[in-house]
């Protein structure tokens, strides 16, 4: 079975068990208040409608009469609704605020009386309104503004439905943020969406662009026939008290309304006629994870393209959680990808597909006891063809926020060893160390014990491997239950039930592969250099860098950040990764997340671009191979939030406009992780010396999507054919409203002509 076939099957399997109630109590107005949008027109329409609620007695009497008549008409029609397609319409252009009536279409009376069914439509929006109704059915008379059904989109990529018969009767909502696209390759594009209202299963499901997005289960199932006084079917808006609310502008390519509930497989196929980007890692793949974050993408000197990402099992939460590192590769320039593997993983908690709740309480729940890996970095030594995979290693129940101060190592006779605590020892004494050949020593006696660890830090007593019970995790309401199973797994020093326990701080983990990821070395903990005053020292996710020219040619570098005597730092190796040296790049102690990426200038000097807590990206320069760094210089023309976002920057191998070039990817907004841009910077030799020898002219910028669309962590790579590969999070990963979204890690390709063709100078 091909990769696409396996993905479709995986989606179908995950769909079969997906039960995710979302925002059941929230009206569209509530959702609008949660968004930062440009929808002032929408709000004005809603306010006008609410003011009209205070209608006089005559208007109320008239509305009541129409309501009774509408109910009788609906009851008569519902008894005779035919099977199959009730309505079909194609190529409808809609001016914003005008709407388009379908009341005269054949089948409209049946649509008004639907007790269940399926609605499939394609659209292209040219509007920036915050909320835009694509299709609606409702009661448009005075005093009945809360009696309607509609399918809507938001200008931040969300899709949803609202089914209301005034809040006192019923109000059902279902939505999924970051689900649809507005702009692709510089053009406004069509999306295909679908709603299935399934009375037999008491369930509504939303689909878009080949993916099942969200499910709402309601024992008291309702649909259009349950709305009192339905009098209109409308495209491009919702008629509320005689006015068009939630106006859409653009084109409805086609709409089909069915009286029956089509299958999930049919709707995945029907909506899959429009897709943008590819999921290298996706819910239901062999990793058994539903959620992926933190992209890494690298083209090797052989032309193979490799990728890595966090496979997050406990929703999209950071550590502490259960997180493994997924890896995949492409041997045809990113056209197809291998099945993922998990070169960095722990087994203390089961790996399984579980839908994490997104309600206001459940979305905050985290797995408490698992060990985890987080934030991959890929790097190739082009001289040896060896690839390295780095990540932060977090022992059981540890994340950056609760990591203990210290390195986790102890110096014995001038050498540093990983220190351990015997689980029965009183207090917090770490009186044991892992010495040569993995043997555990009692430091008080300086004698070996009968215990040792293997290359994965699994424990042995004499020659018998020790085991512990694996944990499972399941929800009971909004409570997460973590419980032991009957499954035995190898006992590991990073697990909570180990007899020897590692110090509860973060570590830097490394593996290498000499066969492009087919097999991997033993696990190496390389962070013995972590300062003892440091709470955490972690990688800047993305890729590392090898210097290609100058006196430091061949040196390997990986960006790091910390919260002790420096925010930004680096580790480097001059012996092909056998040994690593840590250097601090500043003396800042504010604790800003200084995630950084490195590029090389023509003479072998380095520039690093980093996330800051100052609404900007900063640049620092090194002329000694990364051992010392200049002060930070804010990058002009790119704005970020106060908390910042990881960025990606790479060298491009060919001149652009006759000059060396670098390419950078980042959000460009101060009010959220959104408005993703790709910039091309031309490198100029200033004629100066030292750190001022080169300047970068950010000549071109390219919009990945429209300004309100989410865009978070990203990684760029120059592909073998010269195109630029982009692996990125197509959502706002900081927003609490966008937690725990599936299949938001997208891979796309862009040519240099595309990136320069529409761009404007900064």
Swiss-Prot record:
Organism per entry: Macrobdella decora (North American leech)
Pfam families: BNR_2 (PF13088), Sialidase (PF02973)
Family per similarity comment: Belongs to the glycosyl hydrolase 33 family.
GO cellular component: cytoplasm; extracellular region; intracellular membrane-bounded organelle; membrane
SUPFAM superfamilies membership: Concanavalin A-like lectins/glucanases, Sialidases
GO molecular function: anhydrosialidase activity; exo-alpha-sialidase activity
Signal peptide (residue range): 1-27
Protein name: Anhydrosialidase
Catalytic site: 318, 595, 713
EC number: 4.2.2.15
InterPro entries: ConA-like_dom_sf, Glyco_hydro_33_N, Sialidase, Sialidase_fam, Sialidase_sf, Trans_sialidase_dom3
């Amino acid at each position: 079975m091909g990769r696409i076939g396996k993905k479709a099957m995986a989606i179908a399997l995950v769909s079969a068990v997906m039960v995710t109630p979302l925002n059941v109590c929230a009206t569209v107005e509530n959702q609008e208040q949660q968004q930062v949008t440009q929808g002032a027109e929408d709000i004005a329409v809603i306010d006008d409608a609410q003011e009209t609620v205070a209608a006089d007695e005559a208007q109320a009497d008239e509305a009541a009469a129409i309501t009774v008549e509408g109910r009788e008409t609906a009851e008569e029609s519902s008894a005779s609704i035919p099977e199959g397609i009730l309505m079909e319409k194609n190529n409808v252009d809609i001016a914003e605020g005008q709407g388009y009536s379908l009341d005269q279409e054949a089948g409209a009376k049946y649509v008004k009386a639907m007790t269940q069914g399926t609605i499939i439509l394609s659209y292209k929006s040219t509007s920036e309104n915050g909320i835009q109704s694509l299709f609606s059915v409702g009661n448009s008379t005075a005093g009945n503004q809360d009696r309607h059904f509609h399918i809507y989109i938001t200008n931040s990529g969300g899709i949803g439905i609202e089914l209301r018969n005034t809040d006192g009767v019923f109000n059902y909502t279902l939505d999924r943020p970051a689900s649809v696209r507005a702009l692709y390759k510089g053009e406004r594009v069509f999306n295909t969406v679908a709603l299935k209202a399934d009375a037999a299963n008491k369930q509504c499901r939303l689909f878009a662009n080949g993916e099942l997005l969200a499910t709402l289960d309601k024992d008291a199932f309702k649909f259009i026939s349950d709305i009192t006084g339905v009098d209109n079917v409308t495209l491009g808006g919702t008629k509320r008290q005689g006015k068009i609310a939630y106006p859409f502008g653009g084109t409805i390519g086609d709409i089909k309304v069915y009286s029956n509930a089509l299958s999930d497989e049919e709707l995945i196929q029907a909506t899959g006629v429009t897709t943008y980007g590819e999921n290298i890692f996706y819910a239901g793949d062999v990793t058994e994870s539903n959620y992926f974050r933190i992209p890494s993408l690298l083209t090797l000197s052989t032309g193979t393209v490799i990728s890595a990402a966090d496979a997050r099992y406990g929703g999209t939460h950071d550590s502490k959680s259960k997180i493994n590192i997924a890896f995949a590769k492409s041997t045809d320039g990113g056209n197809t990808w291998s099945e993922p593997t998990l070169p960095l993983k722990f087994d203390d908690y089961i790996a399984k597909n579980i839908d994490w709740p997104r309600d206001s309480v459940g979305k905050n729940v985290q797995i408490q006891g698992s060990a985890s890996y987080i934030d991959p970095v890929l790097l190739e030594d082009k001289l040896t063809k060896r690839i390295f995979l780095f990540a932060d290693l977090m022992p059981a129940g540890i994340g950056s926020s609760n990591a203990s101060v210290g390195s986790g190592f102890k110096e014995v006779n001038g050498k540093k060893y990983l220190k351990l605590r015997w689980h029965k020892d009183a207090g917090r004494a770490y009186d044991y160390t892992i010495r040569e050949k993995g043997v555990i020593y009692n430091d008080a006696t300086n004698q070996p014990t009968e215990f040792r660890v293997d290359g994965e830090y699994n424990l042995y007593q004499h020659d018998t491997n020790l085991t512990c019970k694996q944990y499972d995790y399941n929800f009971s309401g909004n409570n997460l239950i973590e419980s032991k199973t009957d499954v035995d797994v190898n006992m590991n020093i990073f697990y909570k039930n180990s007899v020897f326990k590692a110090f509860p701080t973060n570590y830097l983990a490394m593996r290498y592969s000499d066969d492009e990821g087919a097999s991997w070395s033993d696990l190496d903990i390389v962070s013995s250099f972590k300062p003892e005053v440091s709470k955490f020292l972690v990688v800047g996710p993305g890729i590392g860098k090898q210097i290609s020219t100058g006196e430091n040619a061949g040196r390997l570098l990986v960006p790091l950040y910390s919260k002790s005597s420096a925010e930004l730092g680096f580790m480097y190796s001059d012996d092909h990764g056998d040994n690593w040296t840590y250097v601090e790049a500043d003396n800042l102690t504010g604790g800003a997340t200084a995630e950084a990426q490195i590029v090389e200038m023509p003479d072998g000097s380095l520039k690093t671009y980093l996330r800051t807590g100052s609404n900007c990206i900063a640049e620092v320069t090194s002329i000694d191979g990364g051992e010392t760094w200049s002060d930070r210089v804010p990058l002009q023309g790119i704005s970020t939030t106060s908390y910042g976002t990881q960025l990606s920057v790479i060298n491009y191998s060919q001149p652009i406009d006759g000059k060396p070039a670098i390419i950078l990817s980042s959000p460009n907004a101060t009010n959220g992780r959104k408005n993703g841009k790709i910039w091309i910077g031309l490198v100029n030799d200033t004629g100066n010396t030292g750190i001022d020898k080169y300047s970068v002219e950010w000549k071109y910028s390219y919009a990945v999507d429209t300004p309100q669309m989410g865009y978070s962590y990203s990684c760029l790579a120059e592909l073998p054919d010269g195109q630029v590969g982009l692996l990125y999070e197509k959502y706002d990963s900081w927003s609490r409203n966008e937690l725990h979204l599936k299949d938001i890690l997208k891979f796309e390709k862009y040519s240099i002509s595309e990136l320069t063709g529409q761009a404007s100078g900064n």
